[in-house]
Swiss-Prot record:
Binds 1 [4Fe-4S] cluster per dimer. Pfam families: Fer4_NifH. The key enzymatic reactions in nitrogen fixation are catalyzed by the nitrogenase complex, which has 2 components: the iron protein and the molybdenum-iron protein. This is Nitrogenase iron protein. ATP binds at residues 11-18. GO terms for molecular function: 4 iron, 4 sulfur cluster binding; ATP binding; metal ion binding; nitrogenase activity. The reversible ADP-ribosylation of Arg-102 inactivates the nitrogenase reductase and regulates nitrogenase activity. Belongs to the NifH/BchL/ChlL family. Its cofactor is [4Fe-4S] cluster.
Length: 296
């Protein structure tokens, strides 16, 4: 019996973590792997493409209705979707009330106590909110739940900045546990020299770009139908991209403690690839009118 592999997907908010996670998990299931997704985001959008639903009812919502999480059964919170994929959404409190990360802690503890991590599973994927690596959202790595961390990024500066910050969070917890950075997944935004840039960033962080996922509108067409590419159009080339990503994760053994870089080094990298121009200190603090007058 192969050891259960627990993987967490982090990345900048809006980078496409949930879409990427669900598409690669669908490809894993298609290949015969037994997988569970645990959504760690109050938006509860981590399982919608697997379940063909708007949003799965969350552990926190069900616990509030029942009185407490102790009043729930595993079948209350766990749904099974495409390819036999098990789906759970942790959820969180109403916006502005309480700690959303608490839902992650509550959900994972409940799943463990109820035996959700059974011996038939090959993979568990935690789809984690944005680029937060503190508090409850760090639960998958802080408590040694997830051993493999994949960071979804793109060639945009803020996505790379978030990836570097997440790497810093991994270092903090890696020193006291087994969590490791397993690679960068580039979810393309069609920026200039994007694949080269992310490979260079991966090198600085001491890891690799495990896969470059090209941008394709077919993904949005599938999402409108609440489906993954593997299910929506299995012969499409984009479905093959997710199969390649899934296969690379299956065979991945490159798990490292990352080497995050300073902001100045990140900016130098962006300038090296022509994404960012060198800063001219002489124009700092000048209005458009002042700059125009100086140029006249």
């Amino acid at each position: 019996m192969a050891k259960l592999r627990q993987c967490a997907i982090y990345g900048k908010g809006g980078i496409g973590k949930s879409t990427t996670t669900q598409n690669l998990v669908a490809a894993l299931a298609e290949s015969g792997k037994k997988v569970m997704i645990v959504g760690c985001d109050p938006k509860a959008d981590s399982t919608r493409l697997i379940l063909h639903s708007k949003a799965q009812t969350t552990v926190m919502h069900l616990a509030a209705e029942a009185g407490s999480v102790e009043d729930l059964e595993l079948e209350d919170v766990l749904s099974v979707g495409f390819g036999g994929i098990k789906c759970v959404e942790s959820g969180g409190p109403e916006p502005g009330v309480g700690c959303a990360g608490r839902g992650v802690i509550t959900a994972i503890n409940f799943l463990e106590e109820e035996g959700a991590y059974d011996e038939d599973l090959d993979f568990v994927f935690y789809d984690v909110l944005g680029d937060v690596v503190c508090g409850g959202f760090a639960m998958p790595i802080r408590e040694n739940k997830a051993q493999e961390i994949y960071i979804v990024c793109s060639g945009e500066m803020m996505a790379m900045y978030a990836a570097n910050n997440i790497a810093k969070g991994i270092v903090k917890y890696a020193n006291s546990g087994g969590v490791r950075l397993a690679g960068l997944i580039c979810n393309s935004r069609n920026t200039d020299r994007e694949d080269e840039l992310i490979m260079a960033l991966a090198g600085r962080l001491g890891t690799t770009m495990i896969h470059f996922v090209p941008r394709d509108n077919a993904v949005q067409h599938a999402e409108i139908r609440r489906m993954t590419m593997v299910e929506y159009d299995p012969k499409h080339k984009q479905a093959d991209e997710y199969r390649q990503l899934a296969n690379k994760i299956v065979n991945n053994t490159n798990f490292v403690i990352p080497t995050p870089i300073e902001m100045e080094e990140l900016e130098e990298l962006l300038m090296e690839f022509g994404i960012m121009e060198a800063e001219d200190e002489s124009i700092v603090g000048q209005t458009a009118a002042e700059l125009a007058a100086a140029a006249a």
